[in-house]
């Protein structure tokens, strides 16, 4: 009984850490939310964020077997690799209404082999970092909903659209960590 309560508490903590109730959303909504919690088609907030979720999924049979056994052994041996890429967002373009179904068409992915992204257009662009962390577990099927997370520089403010700022050097930019 104690083991079951411990596991339930862990599951509740994991659920609470996931932003915006992603378990209840469709895969399209899960990858199309902005920082202000709006759906992509109806919002022009910056920047867009693709949510990255790492969750161990086990079938219910394994779950029942582990809950009935006395010792709890959590498998934390999963490892992830990292690949750093860049995205440039032109704020002039994003201030206008998108012509397509999604504002994500305005993103420009720069290959990670490039030393620096292309030159800034007079302070109207902001450099962001995309972190790609696929699972090294061969049983884990790759899906589009767990590919990228857009990391936002620490110093960006809510009135960023009215007051464009110059592009910061990489050493001056602070990124949040997963």
UniProtKB/Swiss-Prot annotation:
Post-translational modification: Phosphorylation on tyrosine residues can be induced by IL6. Phosphorylation is mediated by LYN. Targeted by the ubiquitin E3 ligase subunit FBXO10 to mediate its ubiquitination and degradation.
Expression sites (tissue/organ): Expressed in diffuse large B-cell lymphoma (DLBCL) and several germinal center (GC)-like lymphoma cell lines (at protein level). Highly expressed in normal GC lymphocytes and GC-derived malignancies. Expressed in thymus and spleen.
GO biological process: negative regulation of lymphocyte migration; regulation of B cell receptor signaling pathway
Effect the entry attributes to changing residue 91 to A: Loss of FBXO10-mediated ubiquitination and degradation
Post-translational modification Phosphotyrosine, affected residues: 148
Places the protein is found: Cytoplasm; Cell membrane
Residues bearing PTM Phosphoserine: 99
Xref: InterPro entries: GC_assoc_lym
Subunit structure, as described in the record: Interacts with ACTB and MYH2; the interaction with MYH2 is increased by IL6-induced phosphorylation. Interacts (via C-terminus) with ARHGEF11 (via DH domain). Interacts with ARHGEF12. Interacts with SYK; the interaction increases after B-cell receptor stimulation, resulting in enhanced SYK autophosphorylation and activity.
Protein name (record): Germinal center-associated signaling and motility protein
Lineage: Eukaryota, Metazoa, Chordata, Craniata, Vertebrata
Gene that this polypeptide is encoded by: GCSAM
